[in-house]
């Protein structure tokens, strides 16, 4: 039992170490809308721990956004650099934005990468931009909390499963030990009974045969045959609670026994 417990403890330690390595490896998940990410549920893993969002056409303000892992970019020289492009009006636009958290590039708002359109829009546009930032911050916080719960569940479920498995193994071992002990006790009792009945039967059979041989020999002409043997036989039969229907008679001079 101690050996099995030590094996189970070592197995749990190895599982925890493997989970720690996986969690600290540096890979994060990113939202990906490329064609090769359809099969993986519009998600990808980044070994560089970076996700990106960029405009398909940096010269067009209304250009759609594309998202993915930074590893999938063909050119790695300009990774996470603030590249500036200019549209038709000449205002600078960030063509690439990087982040380093799980699903941090999952933003469906067009104004994530779109700056304000100039000072001419006035104070209202500035307030609208601040509101958009607050909304984005709230979305990021909600996503972070969901990811935190997801990580906790990923860690807790295997540990709980391992503990339940250990408890089931310990319960099965205990049941097997008790069953084995009970079977051994039954076997010992059966062997002792067989041994006692075998030796007791042979000893009683030998005593009865000896008494029969002794009682077949007469003591004298017309005297009772083996009075001592009769007493011993009656004592043995009374001890075993067996009633005998045969009584030894008188020995006659013709050399035969009479039964009553």
Curated annotation (Swiss-Prot):
The chain crosses the membrane at residues 153-173. Residues 27-152 are extracellular. CDD domains: TFP_LU_ECD_BAMBI. GO terms for cellular component: cytoplasm; plasma membrane. Glycans are attached at residue 87. It is a single-pass type I membrane protein. Keywords: Glycoprotein, Membrane, Signal, Transmembrane, Transmembrane helix. Residues 174-260 are cytoplasmic. Residues 1-26 form the signal peptide. It holds the Pfam family BAMBI_C. This is BMP and activin membrane-bound inhibitor homolog. It comes from Ovis aries (Sheep). The gene is BAMBI.
């Amino acid at each position: 039992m101690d050996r099995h417990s030590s094996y189970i403890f070592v197995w749990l330690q190895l599982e925890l170490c493997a989970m720690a390595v996986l969690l600290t490896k540096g890979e994060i998940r990113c939202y990906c809308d490329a064609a090769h990410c359809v099969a993986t549920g519009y998600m990808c893993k980044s070994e560089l721990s970076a996700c990106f969002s960029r405009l398909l056409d940096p010269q067009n303000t209304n250009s759609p956004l594309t998202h993915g892992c930074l590893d999938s970019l063909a050119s790695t020289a300009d990774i996470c650099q603030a590249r500036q492009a200019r549209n038709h009006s000449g205002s600078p636009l960030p063509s690439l934005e990087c982040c380093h958290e799980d699903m941090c590039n999952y933003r469906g708002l067009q104004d994530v990468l779109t700056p304000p359109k100039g000072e001419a829009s006035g104070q209202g546009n500035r307030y609208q931009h601040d509101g958009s930032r607050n909304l984005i911050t709230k979305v990021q916080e909600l996503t972070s909390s969901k990811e935190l719960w997801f990580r906790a569940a990923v860690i807790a479920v295997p540990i709980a499963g391992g503990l339940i498995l250990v408890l089931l193994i310990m319960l099965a071992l205990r049941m097997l030990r008790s069953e084995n002990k009970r079977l051994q006790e039954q076997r010992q009792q059966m062997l002792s009974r067989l041994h006692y009945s075998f030796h007791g039967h042979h000893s009683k059979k030998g005593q009865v045969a000896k008494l029969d041989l002794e009682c077949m020999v007469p003591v004298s002409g017309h005297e009772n045959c083996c009075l001592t043997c009769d007493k011993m036989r009656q004592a043995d039969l009374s001890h075993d609670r067996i009633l005998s229907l045969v009584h030894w008679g008188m020995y006659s001079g013709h050399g035969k026994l009479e039964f009553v």
